[in-house]
């Protein structure tokens, strides 16, 4: 197969591993810089051009679209879909998962466990918003944040009011969530491919920190997940419409709670921690499921 990898940087661990795994299995792997691809949309034959030449003959595309280029990246991916190229994750699903609020609303509608979450626009509603999530301590998250940036733990209601007011003053969209103390600064990253959780790791925040992101100095270790956690991760990925996803789960006193569903999960942490060939499993998934015009939305956007 001829497989495109949409990635800004061919030297990134995840991109390198996907290219290696695909090449080992006999595929032609081509890394395409997402922002350098440009499109002819209105022609009778949809096309993508790259460095002066049309991109042609691709069987599948693996999107590794960073949060900062979601809009343009999804447009390029959608164009691949219009050309009948099989996407590992569809543009519709990626756009859906990048909207944190929309994601939580969809997961909530399907009865998937979530931390109590509040969202408001007016500063006048802050006291009631804090009450709604069971008061302090609570967590405030900027909707556009990634890798733990823009996430604040407020120990008191007074501190929470000040932080929420500050974010609102900066015209930042934020959500307020209950703090799950019993999780102890740890979460579980479940790596979903197709209809299986193929690997899982526990991420523990460093001492004095509550954000467990590996980018924030958290440490990763092997973990055995429960059947309920496995089912929660699979259901969350399915609700978002993602074939490959990193589902972040907290262990709470009332069962597993989904924090986030990541449509472009990094491979380095999970491969290093579990010793599994995750990139190879992803390529196998494409071999089994890929084919011309195989998007679930049938390229309708």
From Swiss-Prot:
Q: What class of enzyme is it?
A: ligase
Sites binding Mn(2+) 2 sit at 260, 262
Which annotated residues bind Mg(2+) 2? 260, 262
Family annotation (InterPro entries): ATP-grasp, ATP-grasp_RimK-type, ATP_grasp_subdomain_1, RimK, Rimk_N, Rp_bS6_RimK/Lys_biosynth_LsyX
PROSITE patterns attached to this UniProt entry: ATP_GRASP
Cofactor names: Mg(2+); Mn(2+)
Query: One GO CC annotation, please?
Result: cytoplasm
Q: Does the keyword Protein biosynthesis apply?
A: yes
**What are the recorded GO MF terms, alphabetically?**
ATP binding; metal ion binding; ribosomal S6-glutamic acid ligase activity
Keyword line = ATP-binding, Ligase, Magnesium, Manganese, Metal-binding, Nucleotide-binding, Protein biosynthesis
The UniProt annotation places Mn(2+) 1 binding at 248, 260
Q: Name one Pfam family in it.
A: Rimk_N
According to the record, how does the cofactor bind?
Answer: Binds 2 magnesium or manganese ions per subunit.
Looking at the record, the residues that make up the ATP-grasp domain are 104-287
Q: What is its EC number?
A: 6.3.2.-
Q: Which residues bind ATP?
A: 141, 178-179, 187, 211-213
Which GO BP terms sit in this record?
Answer: protein modification process; SOS response; translation
Task: List ligand-binding residues for Mg(2+) 1.
Answer: 248, 260
Q: Which family does it belong to?
A: Belongs to the RimK family.
Q: Which NCBIfam families match?
A: PRK10446.1, rimK_fam
Q: Protein name, please?
A: Probable alpha-L-glutamate ligase
Q: Which gene encodes it?
A: rimK
């Amino acid at each position: 197969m001829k497989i495109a990898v949409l990635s800004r940087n061919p030297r990134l661990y995840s991109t390198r591993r996907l290219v290696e795994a695909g090449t080992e299995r006999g595929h032609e792997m081509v890394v395409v810089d997402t922002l350098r691809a440009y499109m002819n949309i209105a022609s009778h034959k949809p096309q993508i051009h790259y460095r002066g030449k049309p991109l042609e003959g691709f069987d599948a595309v693996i999107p590794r679209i960073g949060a900062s280029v979601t809009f343009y990246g999804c447009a390029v991916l959608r164009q691949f879909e219009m050309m009948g190229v099989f996407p590992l994750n569809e543009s519709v699903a990626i756009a859906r998962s990048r909207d944190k609020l929309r994601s939580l609303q969809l997961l909530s509608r399907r009865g998937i466990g979530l931390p109590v979450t509040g969202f408001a626009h007016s500063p006048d509603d802050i006291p009631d918003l804090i009450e709604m999530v069971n008061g302090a301590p609570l967590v405030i998250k900027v909707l556009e944040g990634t890798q733990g940036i823009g996430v604040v733990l407020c120990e008191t209601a007074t501190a929470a009011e000040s932080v929420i007011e500050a974010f609102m003053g900066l015209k930042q969209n934020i959500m307020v969530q209950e703090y799950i103390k019993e999780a102890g600064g740890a979460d579980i990253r479940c790596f979903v491919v197709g209809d299986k959780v193929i690997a899982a790791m526990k991420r523990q925040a460093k001492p004095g920190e509550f954000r467990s992101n590996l980018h924030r100095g958290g440490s990763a270790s092997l973990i055995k997940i429960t059947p309920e956690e496995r089912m929660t991760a699979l259901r969350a990925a399915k609700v978002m419409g993602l074939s490959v996803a990193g589902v972040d789960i907290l262990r709470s006193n009332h069962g597993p709670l989904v924090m986030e569903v990541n449509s472009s999960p990094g491979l380095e942490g999970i491969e290093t921690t579990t010793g599994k060939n995750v990139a190879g499993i992803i390529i196998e998934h494409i071999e089994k499921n890929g084919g011309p015009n195989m998007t679930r939305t049938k390229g309708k956007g």
